[in-house]
Amino acid sequence: MKIALSGKSGCGNTTVSSMIAKHYGLEFINYTFHDIARERNIPFSEFYEKEIIGRDDYYWDRYLDKRLFALSKKNNTVLASRLAIWISKSADLKIYLYAKMEVRAERIMTREGGMYSDVLSSTFNRDENDKKRYLAIYNIDIDDYSSETDLVIDVTNINSNEVFELIRDEIDKRNLKN
């Protein structure tokens, strides 16, 4: 079974994907810019500003997505990334998580700290930068996900356990097996 899960920052992509992987005994694949920054011993904010926003050759996007594309070919996986539903063409189930920006900012603030107004602003800016980059690199509009998904879940008012249950119900309904 192969599952691809996408959504913007603060929607619970990583949390829910890891829950699915653990429950079904699947490999959890989630390689992000945070991981690259950590590997390079650079704070994420500095890496993002200098290496993602500050470059116009999209080197790190291509590096990350090439790695994710190769990993997406493996079986018995849950791939969690902004572009997972577009990258993993052979996924048995493609899921997109959605939440209002204000809720995502609250969740990010809880996870990472900071002042709400700053987190809200940076969340908005990151969304805009992501959209611009993915359009430029791949001609993918990350706000136009409906044709790429089997299941869209608005997570604005539900927690990760409830999201997991909805996904588990869909997996059972489709009779997907590991």
From Swiss-Prot:
Q: List GO terms (cellular component aspect).
A: cytoplasm
Predominant subcellular localization, coarse grouping: cytoplasm
* InterPro entries (UniProt xref): Cyt_kin_arch, Cytidylate_kinase_dom, P-loop_NTPase
Query: Its catalytic activity?
Result: CMP + ATP = CDP + ADP; dCMP + ATP = dCDP + ADP
Q: What class of enzyme is it?
A: transferase
Enzyme Commission number:
2.7.4.25
Which species is this UniProt entry from?
Borreliella afzelii (strain PKo)
Tell me the first and last residues of the signal peptide: none
**Care to name a GO molecular-function term for this sequence?**
ATP binding
Q: Report the SUPFAM superfamilies cross-referenced here.
A: P-loop containing nucleoside triphosphate hydrolases
Q: Name the protein family.
A: Belongs to the cytidylate kinase family. Type 2 subfamily.
**Keyword Signal part of the UniProt annotation:** no
Q: Is Transferase tagged as a keyword?
A: yes
Protein name listed in UniProt = Cytidylate kinase 2
Top-level taxon of origin? Bacteria
Please list the residues that bind ATP: G7, K8, S9, G10, C11, G12, N13, T14, T15
Report the locations given in the UniProt record.
Cytoplasm
Provide a GO biological process annotation.
pyrimidine nucleotide metabolic process
Give the UniProt keywords, A-Z: ATP-binding, Cytoplasm, Kinase, Nucleotide-binding, Transferase
